[in-house]
Amino acid sequence: MKNKIIASLKERISRQNWENWFLDFNIRELKDNHVVFEVGNFFIKERLEKKFNKIISKVVKDILGKDATYEITFKEIPYETKVESGPLIKKRPLLITPLNPKYTFENLVVGEFNKFAYNVFLEASKNPGFYNPIFLYSGVGLGKTHLAQALGNYLLETDPDMKVAYLTSEEFMNEMFSAIKNGNIDEFREKYRKKADILIIDDIQFLIGIKSAQTELFHTFNTIHEAGKQIIICSDRTPQELKDFHSRMISRFQMGLLVKIEKPSSEDLFKIGKKISEMKNVEIDDEIIKYISKIYDNPRLIHGAILRLIAYRNLYGTLNLSIAESILTNVSKPPKSFEEKLLEILSEIFDCSPDDITSSKRTKNISYARKIGMYFAVKKLNLSTRDVGTIFKKSHSSVVQNVKQVEKLLKEGNVILKNYLKQIDKMSKGFAQGESM
């Protein structure tokens, strides 16, 4: 009977899906009209229950009767937290994941907005594990990645044998899924739990709603922390604002040191602009940099503005304040302006507040505003789904899903939706990129 159930499932599931998700699938127990299936890990269990529930249920009922039921379990793999002692073997330096060598403490502009964060990370680089974990959060483009990688680069400079693992949460998730698919999950865990001396996870907010990846990170976190190794988590929001995250994971983030990078002042932004031009070996007049620091409110945008001005000067051989103003006012407004303007427009049209739109509320008008706003930001403002996720405080996958839903409705000729988009386009008064609707 067990073989019959497996054979029937194999007939109904495509070869690719079978090879991806069912190679480790077997029946652990068959009693009366109840089947207990077993798979290799929690992630596959979660995937099968969501995507293949109807097929599995139908096969079980067809063979065992209409009252038959099933459940899926997974093999519990013990999580090792013990650090074994043994002879130290001098090995060639190993960088587990790449770092940008340009991110150093020396070229980081320090002001009142990031002084506390800078001092914490400098101390942590000299004494890893003293502040553990460190949870670093701030708005977009304020230097979280620079600070985190500066710590990693400092450690490698002072100890070339230090094994630093820096990656975004999305990279962690994708690597985990790939390891599961290819049967290399043990190697994946070995890499991050035992080989890494320091683990830096950037953009943790992109794991919102992805429970399987959160579970894997939870056990990785515990293993590294219990071994006394440094953990750094970077986010665009506080731990409490990580909605749809395991509470046990949030408690781990809160057990350490919470560090915030504040919004930089105009003076801070001017210093950052000067530093960027110095690093590019290009002299830009102070009046131009002052102008840039007034119209842009974060270091990333200032960096982009200076690159545009450098490109112009290299091409035409001249640059002054008048030219700079013309160049920078003829390009798109910075994402912060996009964010504020778009949320204001949506809140006005759908009779709700900007906070409602970025919240987890699911009332019809708020959900509709959020969905349409995401589509408009991706398709009309040409923002990446990652940036849109940051604006709306939602996961990357949620943005992709909402955009696809709107595309589907538009293809079906939804007149109401088209009218809403036209209204948003009209109210935006040209701040959107691309053609008008």
Swiss-Prot record:
Q: Could you describe the subunit structure of this protein?
A: Oligomerizes as a right-handed, spiral filament on DNA at oriC.
User: Which residue intervals make up region (Domain IV, binds dsDNA)?
Assistant: 314-437
* Protein name per the record: Chromosomal replication initiator protein DnaA
Sites where the protein binds ATP? 141, 143-145
What residue spans carry the region label Domain III, AAA+ region? 98-313
Localization recorded for this chain is: Cytoplasm
The family annotation for this protein states: Belongs to the DnaA family.
Please name the source species.
Thermosipho melanesiensis (strain DSM 12029 / CIP 104789 / BI429)
Q: What is known of its domains?
A: Domain I is involved in oligomerization and binding regulators, domain II is flexibile and of varying length in different bacteria, domain III forms the AAA+ region, while domain IV binds dsDNA.
Q: What SUPFAM superfamilies does this protein's entry cite?
A: P-loop containing nucleoside triphosphate hydrolases, TrpR-like
Write out the ranges of the annotated region (Domain II). Answer: 67-97
A single GO BP: regulation of DNA replication
| Sorted UniProt keywords | ATP-binding, Cytoplasm, DNA replication, DNA-binding, Lipid-binding, Nucleotide-binding
- Report the GO terms under cellular component: cytoplasm; plasma membrane
Record-linked InterPro entries: AAA+_ATPase, Chromosome_initiator_DnaA, Chromosome_initiator_DnaA-like, DnaA_C, DnaA_dom, DnaA_N_dom, DnaA_N_sf, P-loop_NTPase
Q: What does this protein do?
A: Plays an essential role in the initiation and regulation of chromosomal replication. ATP-DnaA binds to the origin of replication (oriC) to initiate formation of the DNA replication initiation complex once per cell cycle. Binds the DnaA box (a 9 base pair repeat at the origin) and separates the double-stranded (ds)DNA. Forms a right-handed helical filament on oriC DNA; dsDNA binds to the exterior of the filament while single-stranded (ss)DNA is stabiized in the filament's interior.
Domain I, interacts with DnaA modulators: annotated segments:
1-67
Pfam families (UniProt xref)? Bac_DnaA, Bac_DnaA_C, DnaA_N
Any one GO molecular function term: ATP hydrolysis activity
